[in-house]
A protein has these predicted regions:
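Divalent cation-coordinating acidic motifs and surrounding scaffolds
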Residues: 1-61, 66, 70-95, 99
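Terminal, contiguous helix-loop blocks that mediate binding/assembly
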Residues: 73-179
Length: 179
């Protein structure tokens, strides 16, 4: 158990509440290791998720800075200031590798809560990897609402596990901005 959550069960997140804090720190001096802006580490994260939490449906959620064809993210936890975003085609390569390894066809959704990720280059890179891709082609001036909006989206998904992809997409569009 971590912070009162039995993480050995595939549905451990459903036992969480808004007050649950799950925190794991990287070792000091881990610069250049365990970086979520490293495509191979992202691939290892997918392996970890698929092997430890088998499911009938999968979604992938990204929250960070987007840069269209230049990439997404940039790990800032180690003082490198997020200077190495993952390119769209690098995502595709690692996702396809993991899908082949775990015999998964595609994600139900991929959600980029980030600027500029609705470009044709990103859409092309994620083509066929998901049923629904959420991505904004413009700047998102929602920085102070990121966590609130994401908590609502995840809460809605947890409260409606059988929701179809189009209904979930409609919910996301209707609740993008705070009311």
């Amino acid at each position: 158990k971590e912070n009162g959550i039995d993480i050995s069960k595939p549905n451990f997140i459903s036992n969480a509440s808004r007050d649950t804090v799950v925190e794991e720190r990287f070792d000091e001096g881990s610069k250049y290791k365990n970086r979520m802006d490293d495509p191979e580490f992202f691939g290892e994260f997918l392996d970890w998720g698929f092997s430890n939490f088998p499911a009938e449906r999968y979604g992938l959620f990204f929250l960070d800075h987007g840069g269209s064809w230049t990439g997404f993210g940039g790990d800032e936890q180690d003082g490198l200031h997020g200077s190495n975003p993952i390119k769209p085609r690098a995502f595709r390569k690692e996702i396809n590798r993991a899908f082949n390894k775990y015999k998964i066809n595609k994600f139900d959704f991929v959600n980029f809560f980030a600027c500029l990720m609705g470009s044709v280059e990103v859409l092309d890179a994620f083509d066929g990897l998901c049923d629904v891709l959420y991505a904004n082609p413009e700047i998102c001036y929602l920085w102070k609402y990121n966590h609130e909006a994401r908590a609502r989206f995840i809460g809605h998904l947890l409260n409606n596990p059988d929701i179809d992809n189009i209904s979930l997409a409609n919910y996301e569009v209707d609740n993008w901005m705070p009311k």
